[in-house]
């Protein structure tokens, strides 16, 4: 190991680090970012950061080796060009939704695929997933379902009270 070049050791550490991140993530999405300005990428990073997601830009060789080490399949022939990986740590849909919104805003951003629940998802599946509201939106929908019957009962009681009061 003493004769190994420092750059090889560094690259192996990068592969190991990325493989650990991928194994511990809820989901991730791979996309080609060629054409995005630094301001666009910074805005995307901020959106991802607010949902406890991260954006990584690595060489395709390192990404492929990290995918192999993490047991990720489906991206073998898709890692060409300048790619970025948005990794979701908490909300499975947050990173996919953020990148899909950027891809709709800028035609030159190409989504290569996503990985969710240990399965590869193509662009059609990604569009379906991006249409699902985020965790907070789903919570608010659930809460409104619980409160709607109670609210209707209260409106009914108020109407009866107003009728008797007249």
UniProtKB/Swiss-Prot annotation:
Residue ranges crossing the lipid bilayer per the database entry: none
Annotated keywords: Ribonucleoprotein, Ribosomal protein, RNA-binding, rRNA-binding
GO molecular function, one term: structural constituent of ribosome
GO BP of this protein: translation
Name of one Pfam family that matches: Ribosomal_L10
InterPro entries in alphabetical order: Ribosomal_uL10, Ribosomal_uL10-like_sf, Ribosomal_uL10_bac, Ribosomal_uL10_bac_type, Ribosomal_uL10_CS_bac
GO cellular component: large ribosomal subunit
HAMAP family assigned to the protein according to its UniProt record, in alphabetical order: Ribosomal_uL10
PANTHER family attached to this UniProt entry: 39S RIBOSOMAL PROTEIN L10, MITOCHONDRIAL
Job description of the protein: Forms part of the ribosomal stalk, playing a central role in the interaction of the ribosome with GTP-bound translation factors.
Subunit structure: Part of the ribosomal stalk of the 50S ribosomal subunit. The N-terminus interacts with L11 and the large rRNA to form the base of the stalk. The C-terminus forms an elongated spine to which L12 dimers bind in a sequential fashion forming a multimeric L10(L12)X complex.
Alphabetized NCBIfam families for the sequence: PRK00099.1-1
Record-stated family: Belongs to the universal ribosomal protein uL10 family.
Protein name: Large ribosomal subunit protein uL10
Organism: Ureaplasma urealyticum serovar 10 (strain ATCC 33699 / Western)
Organismal lineage: Bacteria, Bacillati, Mycoplasmatota, Mycoplasmoidales, Mycoplasmoidaceae
């Amino acid at each position: 190991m003493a004769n190994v070049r420092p750059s090889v050791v560094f690259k192996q550490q990068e592969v190991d680090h990325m493989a650990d991140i991928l194994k511990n993530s809820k989901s991730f999405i791979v996309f080609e970012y060629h054409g995005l300005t630094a301001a666009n990428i910074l805005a995307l990073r901020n959106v991802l950061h607010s949902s406890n997601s991260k954006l990584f830009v690595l060489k395709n060789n390192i990404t492929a080796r990290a995918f192999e080490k993490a047991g990720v399949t489906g991206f073998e022939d898709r890692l060409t060009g300048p790619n970025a990986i948005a990794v979701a740590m908490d909300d499975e849909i947050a990173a996919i939704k953020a990148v899909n919104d950027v891809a709709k805003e800028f035609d030159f951003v190409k989504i290569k695929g996503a990985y969710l629940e240990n399965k590869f998802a193509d662009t059609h599946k990604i569009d379906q997933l991006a249409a699902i509201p985020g965790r907070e939106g789903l919570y608010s929908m659930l809460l409104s379902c619980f409160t709607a019957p109670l609210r209707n009962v209260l409106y009914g009681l108020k109407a009866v009270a107003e009728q008797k009061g007249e």
